[in-house]
Amino acid sequence: MTAYGKTFRIHKFRTMVNDADRMGTAVTVKDDNRITKLGAFIRNVRLDEIPQLFDVIFGNMSFVGTRPEVPKYVKHYTDEMFATLFLPAGITSKTSIIFKDEDKFLNAGNNPDEIYVDEILPEKMKYNLDYLKDFSIWKDCLIMVETLIKVFKR
């Protein structure tokens, strides 16, 4: 979902097997068997995000903003969390930098969806709401630089 709860089909390179969405959760875990070998490489160097430039061109996303969320998880938002849908979703965010290895946290239990909703989503939303309260072009530039540093440090 992006601004004002609008759903859209996000552009990404295919990194998973066909019908992966029917084979597991909406989140991916570490060593997820639905991710192809080439897909693992593409994800590791974050090349899967490049097609999202089309989403920026089409007006569905911005370069920096809260990451788009799957509608399945938006239904768990508190009233305060819905504020993150006032701006277009971003290709990168402070939250995506901090949670770049989210898949490892999801391996901590038997139910990745439950871990995501109960533990990860509330933490992500703290950072997203902080961003909304104090966003600026300058901070967006810093987030883009920090993102590039994280990608090239891998």
Where are these regions (language model features)?
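Conserved small/aromatic sequence motifs within transmembrane helices
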Residues: 1-154
